[in-house]
Swiss-Prot record:
InterPro entries per UniProt: Ribosomal_eL31, Ribosomal_eL31_CS, Ribosomal_eL31_dom_sf
Name of the featured protein: Large ribosomal subunit protein eL31
Family that this chain belongs to: Belongs to the eukaryotic ribosomal protein eL31 family.
Record keywords: Ribonucleoprotein, Ribosomal protein
GO annotation, cellular component aspect: cytosolic large ribosomal subunit
Stored CDD domains: Ribosomal_L31e (cd00463)
Biological process, per Gene Ontology: cytoplasmic translation
A molecular function GO annotation: structural constituent of ribosome
Pfam families: Ribosomal_L31e
Lineage: superkingdom: Archaea
Keyword Mitochondrion: no
């Protein structure tokens, strides 16, 4: 009946978030999350809606408040057979 999701592809990326520092201070962390989403969508050829940001990655981006997201994040990306892409912070 229901098909199990299988991992089709696994990759690691270091995503540079320095462009988030171009926008105003009160929008940087939210913009950085969007940068991650767009970067992964472009590299794995999926729609940005299909990219799911993991909780640990989200906490890492927001850890120093909205004004000071990290300059880079090291992530692990898994693409599933149904087209969904999950992004997690690398340990």
């Amino acid at each position: 009946m229901s098909e199990e999701k299988k991992v089709v592809l696994t990759r690691e990326y270091i995503i540079n978030l320095r462009r988030a520092y171009v926008v105003s201070r009160t929008k940087r962390a939210k913009y950085a999350v969007g940068l991650v989403r767009r970067f992964i969508a472009r590299h794995l050829k999926v729609e940005p809606k299909a990219v799911k940001i993991g909780q640990r990655l989200n906490m890492a981006i927001w850890s120093r408040s909205i004004e000071k997201p990290p300059r880079k994040v090291h992530v692990v990306v898994e693409k599933y057979s149904d087209g969904v892409v999950k992004v997690e912070l690398k340990e």
